[in-house]
């Protein structure tokens, strides 16, 4: 089987797809991976054949991310995202069509509109992949996953769907047209779902399967990209060797006052009898003098760092949350946008962390209390360990490969 994998987004969006590509290759299939050419080195490092797209560099991505975060109106925020996405996806269509013609299946993220258009234009079946619950009209909940009752849910979906469609179809139909197809309606909903197979790359231990999803939706478990060859800097390895540290980092979150946030973080951990690894992230945390028990780090693979940590405070990205689940450590979420609040709430529901906090409301006092729970609540720690054991026993990429193979042979 020849698979084309296409995705968009940041490092956290790309890594799970690289994990799937690596597993497909190990199972004897052919793979071509298409994403921003800024990930060429990452793909080469794990041995996944890669065709880069000249889309954006990290500086451009961060600039657009800041535009998104600065928008207070949620519909306008979505429009900014789609404007950015549509430009990139339209330019990618010729490459994606050429690759899709040579593929037996196209595997894509929900926002890879160009890949879906290319697949449908050339007649190649496509499989959608989700790292949080797919956005779909369901009777059991409204657009924000709150159950408003059958009538309320239907009304909320109608209003929300109309607003999204009016704001985004006009921006995304040029992507569809670039593939030689007539205009689509409701593109964001339509392109993010496959009529054949939709893989939900989440552990059922972390989030139970929605009973309203039909047989074309498969909950596979998480897809982790292990990096056994990672060698940490000597000073970091020595810092974490004596005792498991607290890890604090907000990943690709940006658009807040990093200096002020760093001050709040340092105030919270000043008297803490525990070492702290502070990850600078895209925002550039740690831009001031740090006490001896705080180590400033840049990128460190979650699999390596979290396995050595006591707990983690992070932004609530789906991939970061999954990595902390897998490590079996308590976690607290300081959220900013997207599905981060959802994951923060889910962590609290599972009892492996305190209720989430908004980035804009982050104060040292709250963080001190959160760290006290993370470090000293034995029941919370026990639940996190049990969850971690269950997730480590799963084979998410293996289940995904088997589901794709079954779909392919059944056609």
Where are these regions (language model features)?
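Conserved nucleotide-sugar donor-interacting segment of glycosyltransferase catalytic cores
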Residues: 87-156, 205
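Short, polar loop motifs at secondary-structure junctions
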Residues: 34-40, 110-114, 203-207, 280-286
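Short gly/pro/ser/thr-enriched loop/turn and capping motifs at secondary-structure boundaries
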Residues: 39-41, 57-61, 128, 133-139, ...
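A short helix->loop->beta-strand "cap" motif at the edges of active sites that frequently abuts
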Residues: 48, 122-125, 274, 329
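Generic beta-sheet signal
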Residues: 34-36, 53, 109, 129-132, ...
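Phosphate/nucleotide-donor binding subsite
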Residues: 49-103, 158, 172
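Donor-nucleotide binding loops and adjacent catalytic segments primarily
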Residues: 205-311
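Nucleotide-activated sugar donor-binding and catalytic core shared by glycosyltransferases
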Residues: 1-11, 15-32, 38-49, 80, ...
